[in-house]
Regions:
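DUTPase catalytic domain/fold
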Residues: 1-93
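Single conserved hydrophobic/aromatic residue that forms the stacking wall/gate
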Residues: 92, 97-101
């Protein structure tokens, strides 16, 4: 933890995309981008590569979940939302994603 009591999460990337970031002050979660263009047909799913690796401290977890706007406008959801990212030494982030329309 840092001096403010915040858990320190480390990201490493193999992509030119920016690291995950909070779009607005007060956002509960960070936005993450796909590292590839993917077309998901209606009622099908795909695993999307983010090009990111993450280290979460022991005893904590990260969560991946759908953005409400993306889900409402396009029917795109994280398949097992919220998806748990366990505290292991080094995890490659991929998103199992489904198109529900």
């Amino acid at each position: 933890m840092d001096k403010y009591g915040r858990v320190q999460i480390k990201f490493y990337k193999e992509t030119d995309n920016p690291l995950p970031e909070y779009k607005k002050a007060g956002d509960a979660g960070m936005d993450i981008r796909a590292n590839e263009d993917v077309t998901i047909r209606g009622f099908h799913w795909a695993t999307i590569n983010t090009g990111l690796y993450i280290i979460i401290p022991f005893g904590y977890e990260g969560q991946m979940r759908s953005r409400s706007g993306l889900a409402a406008k396009h029917g795109v959801h994280v398949l097992n939302s919220p998806g748990t990212i366990d505290s292991v030494s080094y995890t490659h982030l991929t998103l199992p994603t489904i198109c529900s329309v």
